[in-house]
Amino acid sequence: MDFRILATSTSSLSKVSADALLIVVAGDPKQQGLDDPLDRVLSDAIAAGDLAFKAGRTLYLHRPLGVKAARVVFAVAGDAGPKAFKSAVAAGLGLIKPLGVKHLAVAASGAIEDSHAEAAAAAASDATYSYRHTKPSASPAPALQKITLLVDKAEAKAAQTGLSRGAAIALGVALARECANRPGNHCTPSFLAAEARKLAKLPRIKVDVLDRKACEKLGMGSFLAVAQGSDEPPKFIVLRYDGASRSDAPVVLVGKGITFDTGGISIKPAAEMDEMKYDMGGAASVLGSFRAVAELQPQVNVVGLIPSCENMPSGRAIKPGDVVTSMSGQTIEVLNTDAEGRLILCDALTYAERFKPAVVIDIATLTGACVIALGHHRSGLFSADDALADALLDAGSAGLDPAWRMPLDDEYEEALRSNFADMGNVGGRAGGAITAAMFLKKFTAKYRWAHLDIAGTAWKSGAAKGATGRPVPLLTHFVLSRTR
């Protein structure tokens, strides 16, 4: 997608040349500040009842008198903020996408700040993404190729910054969605490793992939215990973005990469098990964040760690009651083989120590309990570090990718006690998302750490089934906030 900024004013929108003109309106319908042809058709439409001034409402007009653009769409935003602006742009694109429009101009009756410009890029990317890798019958790609954001001259510089940031994040979100949407027989650990190696062709990114033998040498007994039930070879993927001095401690992103999760011997119910291809959503978000960072080139060092394998039942698979030894030396009683994400993450969290990180953030589709607690709108955020938690919450707000902080009280650790190992891998149904985070916390004593449980936000079910690409916007904004 070609995103551009054009400095103009709302008093001359009728003269803009484009295949279609999308105008986001909000506030008082009589105070939109549009030039005469557009103000007149808007007023007439409202008076006739063709457009109710309510959030989400749209109106399509073909060749309105006195307007250069062949098509005009009005989209009503609930308020003047970037979230409402994004929703309105998305609604307008829903009308425009089937029309074969190649060049769309987007304007607003109110101010367009950098956050609005970023939101416009996100809305356009979401609207034009379509999965077709394994679906030859999928609809053709939308014709839309170019979006010009119309802003006042005084807004142009900030809008360009936001649009560039939004375009970069959109590339990352698209990569994360594409990886996560691949079926499990296509998206294997080897596939994720290959996608990571593609990123190494971009500036400042290096990639190394550790195989089973290398992981054995490192003592990653917990990760390899999960992997041993599958015929697919495990991969431990290490990405580095070197944007600052070597002496600068990096941000480390750790993404859970279970490319298919049957539950193992503690096998899942058949219903909706197909959605367990999305259990590598954390890994996808790390790859997507690196794609965005490579585009933006911030002055910060970033490391990505992706432990990737399948969780399968077989004669070699781990069993309930087995005890495994993690890379940290701590032993774990595997009470439920379907709580495997934490078993692969704990070794990655120990491996992260070698980078002497500024902060470590792990991202995982970890628990159904988090979905019960928070639904599908906010990711669960766990951290004992108030400053880090606040920074991540701010990043989520800035990227329209919100999270909600959950508790990590020491008392929850009691649930993980085991008579046969240093800890159990589950703590019962009560507070399941919290006890999962408490398990991970046991491997993070040497650095500042946060955990994002994205089980409710990494994908959608039902008619709109598909990966969301979250939390790439949150992670990218967080990395940018660390720039010197």
UniProtKB/Swiss-Prot annotation:
Biological-process GO terms, alphabetical: proteolysis
Cofactor requirements of the protein: Mn(2+)
Highest taxon above the source species: Bacteria
Keywords associated with the record: Aminopeptidase, Cytoplasm, Hydrolase, Manganese, Metal-binding, Protease
PROSITE patterns, alphabetized: CYTOSOL_AP
Alphabetical list of Pfam families matching this protein: Peptidase_M17, Peptidase_M17_N
Localization per record: Cytoplasm
Record function comment: Presumably involved in the processing and regular turnover of intracellular proteins. Catalyzes the removal of unsubstituted N-terminal amino acids from various peptides.
Protein name in UniProt: Probable cytosol aminopeptidase
Species of the source: Methylibium petroleiphilum (strain ATCC BAA-1232 / LMG 22953 / PM1)
